[in-house]
Amino acid sequence: MCIRDSSESEPIIDFIDNNKIDLKYILNTHHHHDHIGGNLELKKKYNCDVIGFKDDKNRIPGINILVENNQIWQKGNFEAKIYHTPGHTSGHIAFHFFKEKIIFTGDTLFSLGCGRIFEGTYEQMFNSLKIFKKLPKDTLIYCGHEYTLKNSEFCLFNDPDNLKLKEKVLKIKNNHKLNSPTIPSVLDDELECNIFLKAEDIKTFSKLRDLKDNF
């Protein structure tokens, strides 16, 4: 088994031990503490490998497998293409399990949103989002945080005539009432409803990102 971004160890340990799972790999999308906080304890307990971007080798605790842009990482039954997606952080990556049509986008792409820009530039984030737009439309997107409801409100505020978005917002609100997750999302929906993916140029994207920071 592999896990993505071990924010903390205790709930992961409980799940692994209760289900008698053999943890082999931790996949880290970036170095922020809420994504790597459980690395060292999990590695110590299960002797698992920690995978991350080569330029973050001094920022990801326990890292022992370094990957780079466009590399195919393959171990056993696991096979993923690595995309370097800077913007949120300089060393951010995404893991695309292309056979399963699943991508772990970390804090670069959220459902109906994108990550804040901390270490990178608007242009880097804009170009990183372009990578996802080229994937098969039925790709399932597993992001680093479930900000879907708040993101949907921002998208609807800026794209009020989008009928597909209105339908999606209703589903999101219903999911929240039922305490059901909104993740994963489907790329096809994101292409139609996520205003950051719909931005056609860097100027439009930058304006939207600034507006979202203060929404």
Predicted regions: what they are:
Residues 130-140, 149-215:
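Accessory terminal helices/loops
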Residues 72-98, 102-103, 134:
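Core dinuclear metal-dependent hydrolase active-site scaffold
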Residues 1-3:
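Short, small-residue-biased leader/transition segments that mark boundaries at the very start
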Residues 6-8, 31, 55-56, 88-89, ...:
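Active-site metal-binding loops of divalent metal-dependent hydrolases
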